[in-house]
Regions:
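Alpha-helix N-cap/helix-initiation sites
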Residues: 46, 63-68
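Electrostatic cytochrome c docking/interface patches
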Residues: 18-33, 59-63
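Post-cleavage N-terminal segment of exported redox proteins
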Residues: 1-26, 105-111
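Extracytoplasmic c-type cytochrome modules immediately beyond a signal peptide or single-pass transmembrane anchor
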Residues: 5, 25-26, 66-70, 83-84, ...
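Axial heme c-ligation environment in periplasmic c-type cytochrome domains
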Residues: 46-60, 73-105
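Structured helix-beta-strand junction loops
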Residues: 35-36, 77
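The canonical Cys-X-X-Cys-His
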Residues: 37-44, 104
């Protein structure tokens, strides 16, 4: 009995030590993606004028600053190199709400 209690307590303690991740609101991310005009240059699985989101997610996978880099890209409109070699200004997301932009970045990374 004591062993079961200790095992349960240890398992519970381990779950508390895991980082807390909020679930991505996919519906809101897809809406912001569409409203921002992102689908003109990007899709989830096919390269268009810009890279597919799956390629972007793979590029940043496992990198601690991946989400922050995407948030910067979605808010600061930097010059980006297109798949065809040209450069142009990346369009910012159609919101100033940091939580919505972060949700969109997390959705892209989840692809």
């Amino acid at each position: 009995m004591i062993l079961k209690t200790l095992a349960a307590a240890a398992a519970f303690a381990c779950t508390l030590s895991l980082p807390a991740f909020a679930a991505v609101d996919a519906e809101a991310a897809v809406k912001l993606n569409k409203d921002s005009g992102c689908t003109k240059c990007h899709s989830v699985d096919k390269a268009k004028k810009g890279p597919a989101y799956q390629k972007t997610a793979a590029k940043y996978k496992g990198k601690a600053d991946g989400e922050a880099k995407l948030v910067d890209l979605l808010t600061k409109s930097p010059k980006v190199k297109m798949d065809d070699g040209t450069e142009e200004e990346h369009k910012a997301a159609a919101t100033k709400d940091a939580a919505q932009v972060k949700n969109l970045a997390q959705w892209i990374l989840a692809q």
